[in-house]
């Protein structure tokens, strides 16, 4: 399950106090197992312990209380708890953020549906055990999965501590093979053909995120406007729609000791669309040992043994049979989208989402937006 996600910036001064999950950029301080915060048995933020205990015992086979709920730190995204029963059985509970009111942005039923459907595919996911939308049980809907043992690699130190160089190599290969498996899922067979619109994915994404940029920008940044216009003009013809994870990267996968992906995490923004959007985003997040730097530093995949970006792309092309001649377009799109997302985070923090802060303390956010926009433009220009 996803743990604490702490953005690493060019300036590290705010690293301990700023947590970002929209999505996270860079790396996370932490080790291979999720960071948890133990809660008093009868006082767990976001969980009505008595009512949820009753639900567990009546809805989940073999579940017996009392239960211990440990918060797995998760920033501003859906909250995740490790739940341990009296018999030692472990589960994972997911619910929307505290104070959350917009159901469409954190649709637990939709996320549960995706995870449950993918159990009948070649994609490794945690077992989906139950979903509850009854307000009499909790103040917000939640769903429960089985607990999966594995490593969530969030920084280079964790990669070197838990994976051998050979396992790092295999992790890169397994992450690509798993992504290809996601994109190969037969939508009708698993019942997800109506998960989203099939056509026009990139155009819709450009409209959505450019609207967000213009609504929240803190200053003019010509590169964002230029890249938007050029991307809109150059959209490649989309093939058949597939599942698009939307935030596919190393630390949204759990891997075993040998590097094999044992579960893909964080399906909350999954939809249908152009699979190459996932490929482009993985290229942005991934910096192999001999790759040029990304727009941010500290990638876990710089550790010796991990494959480089070109090797990932070659493996995906072989596994999927897809033409990657337009991959720079999708890499540029990924950088541009992340610039728009980070600008929104920066704007909210400038507006007091962290409390009163010195704007200079938040300057690293601005620098990351600038860097991502510059990378988007440079990558697009490489297409000629």
Where are the model-predicted features located?
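ATP/Mg2+ or Mg2+-diphosphate-binding catalytic cores
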Residues: 30-33, 37-42, 215, 296-307, ...
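Activation of the activation-loop gatekeeper triad in protein kinase-fold domains
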Residues: 265-270
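Juxta-kinase regulatory segment immediately upstream of eukaryotic protein kinase catalytic domains
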Residues: 32-63
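C-lobe/activation-segment region of protein kinase-like
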Residues: 278-289
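Catalytic-loop of the protein kinase fold
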Residues: 243-245, 250
């Amino acid at each position: 399950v996803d743990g604490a996600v702490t953005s690493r910036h060019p300036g590290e001064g705010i690293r301990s106090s700023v947590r970002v999950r929209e999505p996270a950029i860079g790396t996370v301080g932490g080790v291979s197992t999720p960071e948890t915060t133990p809660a008093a048995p009868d006082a767990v933020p976001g969980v009505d312990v008595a009512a949820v205990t009753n639900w567990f015992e009546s809805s989940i086979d073999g579940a017996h209380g009392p239960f211990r709920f440990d918060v797995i730190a998760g920033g501003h995204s859906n909250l995740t708890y490790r739940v341990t029963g009296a018999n030692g059985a472990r589960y994972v509970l997911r619910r929307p953020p505290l104070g959350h009111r917009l159901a469409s942005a954190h649709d637990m039923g939709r996320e549960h549906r995706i995870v449950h459907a993918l159990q009948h595919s070649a994609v490794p996911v945690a077992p989906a055990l139950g979903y509850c939308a009854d307000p009499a049980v909790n103040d917000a809907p939640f769903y429960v999965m089985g607990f999966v043992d594995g490593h969530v690699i969030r920084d280079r130190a964790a990669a070197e501590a838990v994976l051998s160089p050979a396992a790092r190599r295999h992790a890169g290969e397994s992450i690509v093979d798993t992504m290809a498996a996601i994109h190969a899922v037969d939508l009708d067979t698993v019942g997800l053909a109506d998960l989203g619109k099939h056509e026009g994915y990139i155009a819709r994404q450009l409209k959505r995120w450019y609207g967000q940029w213009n609504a929240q920008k803190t200053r003019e940044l010509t590169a964002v406007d230029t890249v938007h216009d050029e991307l809109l003009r150059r959209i490649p013809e989309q093939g058949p729609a597939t599942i698009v994870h939307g935030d596919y990267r190393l630390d949204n996968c759990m891997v075993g000791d040998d590097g094999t992906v044992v579960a893909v995490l964080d399906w909350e923004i999954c939809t249908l669309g152009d699979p190459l959007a996932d490929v482009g985003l993985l290229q942005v997040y991934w910096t192999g040992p001999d790759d040029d730097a990304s727009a941010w530093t500290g990638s876990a995949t710089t550790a010796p043994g991990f494959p480089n970006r070109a090797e990932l792309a070659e493996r995906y092309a072989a596994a999927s049979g897809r033409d990657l001649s337009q991959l720079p377009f999708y890499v540029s799109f990924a950088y541009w989208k992340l610039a728009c997302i980070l600008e929104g985070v920066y704007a909210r923090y400038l507006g007091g989402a962290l409390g009163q802060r010195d704007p200079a303390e938040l300057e690293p956010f601005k620098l990351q937006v600038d860097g991502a926009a510059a990378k988007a433009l440079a990558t697009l220009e490489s297409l000629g």
